[in-house]
């Protein structure tokens, strides 16, 4: 997938104060700290909805990860951004709440680096998603124990931010 140069990320300091905007690719090329979010959706059985990233993703293609993740738009709340991407990637909307945030930095083989202040959002949904094949290759529901064990056994099949 081609990432438009117009797509902007919100640059932040380590306390999540906005300090500017930058093109998404440039921020990843220069490893500049920027705001992001990760959504974790559970069903009534306590299983986590995982997605396999589409083959066309510019980094981490075909790797398994949390339900969805992306970057907030300028002026968009964390909750609003999470619900927007749930709809765009997984084809459903549900209430989410923010649990915590953390900073991580992960370089990739393609010269890009994720350096994000990541807001973690949680929600609940019990139906099958209607995945957007441009964003998501596949999905599965797994218990947290099974996720933990599979990451230990197959770490290269999961995204850095999910491990």
Give short role names for the model-derived ranges.
Residues 92-101:
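A short coil-to-beta-strand element that immediately follows conserved catalytic motifs
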Residues 2-38, 44:
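Acidic, metal-coordinating catalytic segment for phosphate/diphosphate chemistry
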